[in-house]
């Protein structure tokens, strides 16, 4: 009986362990002109499916003149819009950094890189593709530099990418060659042997 309990515990642990690979990463981007990663014009972040991009807007704790506080409108654009820093080229407004002295701290916007979204305002991303974000200074702050970001969604290990990952994503299940199958087989042997 005790051995069966140990085997059951191990199987449960392996099941949880295999799901650890699903945990997503968070990538922080501080969207302001003092961020040196924007200075070269090639700020790129590589993400995986189910990762998050957290964009932090400019924030000022101490009082500043209104004209010195940065405010931006962020757009998702196509490649041409990224190269020219022009949001009118098949781009759409994604977020607005318009509260640089928010009492709750800096505004943060999050993008989840997923194959399918249930939300009407969500966006679906594909592995192996690049996505582009640019900012246009707030209308009251024309002449500020254009900040732009390229996000590369890394390819997954499976060859086929379905819009419904729960149907085809092998990394989320026990495979025939994984440790999960070996533990389940061991459990079956113990149960059949009557241990």
Curated annotation (Swiss-Prot):
A lipid is attached at residue 174 (GPI-anchor amidated cysteine). Disulfide bonds join 57-97, 85-146. Residues 1-16 form the signal peptide. GO terms for cellular component: plasma membrane; side of membrane. InterPro entries: Cupredoxin, Ephrin, Ephrin-A_Ecto, Ephrin_CS, Ephrin_RBD. Transmembrane segments: none annotated. Keywords: Cell membrane, Developmental protein, Differentiation, Disulfide bond, Glycoprotein, GPI-anchor, Lipoprotein, Membrane, Neurogenesis, Signal. Residues 24-157 form the Ephrin RBD domain. It is found in: Cell membrane. It comes from the Eukaryota. Residues 175-195 form a propeptide. It is a lipid-anchor; GPI-anchor. Glycans are attached at residue 32. GO terms for biological process: axon guidance; ephrin receptor signaling pathway; osteoclast differentiation. Belongs to the ephrin family. This is Ephrin-A2. It comes from Danio rerio.
């Amino acid at each position: 009986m005790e051995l069966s309990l140990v085997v059951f515990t191990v199987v449960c642990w392996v099941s949880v362990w295999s799901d650890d690979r699903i945990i997503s990463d968070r990538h922080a981007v501080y969207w302001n002109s003092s961020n040196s990663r924007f200075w070269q014009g090639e700020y790129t972040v590589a993400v995986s499916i189910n990762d998050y991009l957290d964009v932090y807007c400019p924030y000022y704790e101490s009082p500043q003149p209104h004209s010195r506080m940065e405010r931006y409108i962020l757009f998702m654009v196509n490649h041409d819009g990224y190269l020219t820093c022009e949001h009118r080229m098949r781009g759409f407004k994604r977020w607005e950094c318009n509260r640089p002295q928010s009492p709750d701290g800096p505004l943060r916007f999050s993008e989840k890189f997923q194959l399918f979204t249930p939300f009407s305002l969500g966006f679906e991303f594909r592995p192996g593709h690049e996505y582009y974000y640019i900012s246009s200074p707030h209308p009251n702050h024309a002449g500020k530099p254009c900040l732009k970001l390229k996000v590369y969604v890394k390819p997954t290990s499976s060859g086929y990418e379905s819009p419904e990952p729960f149907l085809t994503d092998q990394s989320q299940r026990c495979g025939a060659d994984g440790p999960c199958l070996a533990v389940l087989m061991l459990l079956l042997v113990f149960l059949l042997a009557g241990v």
